[in-house]
């Protein structure tokens, strides 16, 4: 009887652990999901304030993904997303970094203890690694393969700043990268953050609605 109980206990433990893992990960790409990303960022924020460490948020969006799906089919689209996720995951793998599928064809990365120059280096490695996959994309006339655009916001958190404000900055950077030709990186500076929180900075994404 004891052996059966022990076997059942191990099975129950493994099932609980598996369910916990599934609750934290995106089922398609294997990256963390949006809920985990948001929760991680909220925990990381006060830690960065206390330790006076920089934080960077990167929003990474697959260019012309709708046209890719339309041309190659949803199964190929899913495979492309998995390959993109695998390519960029390597560059946000430190203990306090996190990469998540943030929705659709968009990924988000939070990097701890980095400045703007370091964040841009990571973003460029991500952008280049996806391009080097050389996934054919006839809908991308300029490049002929699957590419990503990246918006970067790198700041030193303080108590008068919010996580949402920095996410908005990264989103605006992503919008500018799309606007300026895609397959590129755009960053938002500290000064632009100040303009955002004072209402001077206008978010063009509110007008854009949906990216491609």
What are the residue ranges of the model-derived segments?
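Short regulatory alpha-helical coupling segments
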Residues: 20-21, 34-54, 85-94, 112
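Catalytic-core segments of nucleotide cyclases and related cyclic-nucleotide turnover enzymes
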Residues: 112, 116-124, 141, 155-211
């Amino acid at each position: 009887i004891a052996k059966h109980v022990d076997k059942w206990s191990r099975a129950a433990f493994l099932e609980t652990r598996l369910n916990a893992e599934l609750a934290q990960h995106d089922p398609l790409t294997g990256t963390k999901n949006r809920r985990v990303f948001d929760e991680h960022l909220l925990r990381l924020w006060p830690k960065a304030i206390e330790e006076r460490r920089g934080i960077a948020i990167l929003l990474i969006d697959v260019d012309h993904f709708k046209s890719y799906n339309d041309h190659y089919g949803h199964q190929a689209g899913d495979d492309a997303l998995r390959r993109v996720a695998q390519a960029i995951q390597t560059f946000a793998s430190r203990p306090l970094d996190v990469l998540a599928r943030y929705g659709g064809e968009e990924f988000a990365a939070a990097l701890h203890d980095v400045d703007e120059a370091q964040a841009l280096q990571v973003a460029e490695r991500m952008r280049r690694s996806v391009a080097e996959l050389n996934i054919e994309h006839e809908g991308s006339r300029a490049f002929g393969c699957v590419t990503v655009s990246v918006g970067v916001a790198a700041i030193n958190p303080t108590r008068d700043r919010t996580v949402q404000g920095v996410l908005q900055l990264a989103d605006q950077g992503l919008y500018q990268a799309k606007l300026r030709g895609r397959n590129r990186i755009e960053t938002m500076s500290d000064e632009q953050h100040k303009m955002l929180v004072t209402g001077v900075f206008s978010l063009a994404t509110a007008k854009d609605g949906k990216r491609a």
